[in-house]
Amino acid sequence: MTVGSGHRWPEPSMHPTEIAYAKINLALHVRRRRADGYHDIETIFAFAEHGDIVAAEPGPARLMLAGPFAPALAGEDPEDNLVMRAADGLCALAGEAARPAIRLDKRLPVAAGIGGGSADAAAVLRLLGRAYGIAADDPRVMTLAATLGADVPACVRSATVRGGERGDRLESIAADGLHGLPLLLVNPRVALPTGPVFAAWDRVDRGPLAPGDPLAAALAGRNDLEAPATLLHPVIGEVVTLLAAQPGAILARMSGSGATCFALFGSEADRDAADRALAHRRPDWWRLTSRLR
């Protein structure tokens, strides 16, 4: 099928797909509230090897939802979804008059502190950019990404980077020591929008993120949103405590504004043992075993 200015989409069995890699904030320091209502932050973004899956299919333009967490989005206006806004913007950059249909396989919890809509939108930018011959690091794509959300530029890159200002000023860093580290994500099945967590933050600037090696900086750092999120949902503290107590855990912390928490491990055996232990103790919690990209 030909779409827009002559782009031919693959047949149904060959629909291109892209992973919307789960985002992890290894550390997140909130420095101050800005005049525009956002907050200046310092963070280390990292990404799991797994996430939601987006696919582009022949039109008409529409958003099709699938996956275990699709029901959480079912009541939303598709045109308000970041995925469709990303598709609109990328097609405009490419000079395409028509959008393809987008299928979103929602495998990660919603409002969970691991990228969610930002990662999905970023995956669409990469996917359609590849189809239309526009590189993901094209300045126009990164500018578009920043208009969609503060985390979207980092999610477009989906590599370990430092983030400053709103989180959209990115600095490339050497992260060889993080690549491939076994990772366990746990969510107590609590949806936690960002706004209430920032509103509960005590507005105390506890200092900058340390420079240098990202793992060392993360270990010396903190997530300033973990305390207010835990005030809102004390179960988050239980998740972090259980993760930190697992043998072989290197770092356990809440990601983003929650409620998903993570632990990094020195070996896949330790990670898998922790996964089994948490499954036995709290079978109702959502879990994902992965590795850092």
Swiss-Prot record:
Residues reported in the UniProt entry to bind ATP: P109, V110, A111, A112, G113, I114, G115, G116, G117, S118, A119
Membrane-spanning residues: none
Family: Belongs to the GHMP kinase family. IspE subfamily.
Pfam families recorded: GHMP_kinases_C, GHMP_kinases_N
UniProt xrefs under PANTHER family: 4-DIPHOSPHOCYTIDYL-2-C-METHYL-D-ERYTHRITOL KINASE, CHLOROPLASTIC
Keywords for this protein: ATP-binding, Isoprene biosynthesis, Kinase, Nucleotide-binding, Transferase
Catalyzed reaction equations: 4-CDP-2-C-methyl-D-erythritol + ATP = 4-CDP-2-C-methyl-D-erythritol 2-phosphate + ADP + H(+)
Active site (catalytic residues): K23, D151
Coiled-coil regions listed: none
UniProt enzyme class: transferase
InterPro entries from the UniProt entry: GHMP_kinase_C_dom, GHMP_kinase_C_sf, GHMP_kinase_N_dom, IspE, Ribosomal_Su5_D2-typ_SF, Ribsml_uS5_D2-typ_fold_subgr
Biological classification of the source: Bacteria, Pseudomonadati, Pseudomonadota, Alphaproteobacteria, Sphingomonadales
Associated pathway: Isoprenoid biosynthesis; isopentenyl diphosphate biosynthesis via DXP pathway; isopentenyl diphosphate from 1-deoxy-D-xylulose 5-phosphate: step 3/6
Superkingdom per UniProt: Bacteria
Entry annotated with the keyword Nucleotide-binding: yes
HAMAP family, A to Z: IspE
BP-aspect Gene Ontology terms: isopentenyl diphosphate biosynthetic process, methylerythritol 4-phosphate pathway; terpenoid biosynthetic process
Gene3D superfamilies documented for this protein: 3.30.230.10, GHMP kinase, C-terminal domain (3.30.70.890)
Keyword Amino-acid biosynthesis: no
Enzyme Commission code: 2.7.1.148
Organism from which the protein derives: Rhizorhabdus wittichii (strain DSM 6014 / CCUG 31198 / JCM 15750 / NBRC 105917 / EY 4224 / RW1) (Sphingomonas wittichii)
Name of the featured protein: 4-diphosphocytidyl-2-C-methyl-D-erythritol kinase
GO MF terms held by the record: 4-(cytidine 5'-diphospho)-2-C-methyl-D-erythritol kinase activity; ATP binding
Job description of the protein: Catalyzes the phosphorylation of the position 2 hydroxy group of 4-diphosphocytidyl-2C-methyl-D-erythritol.
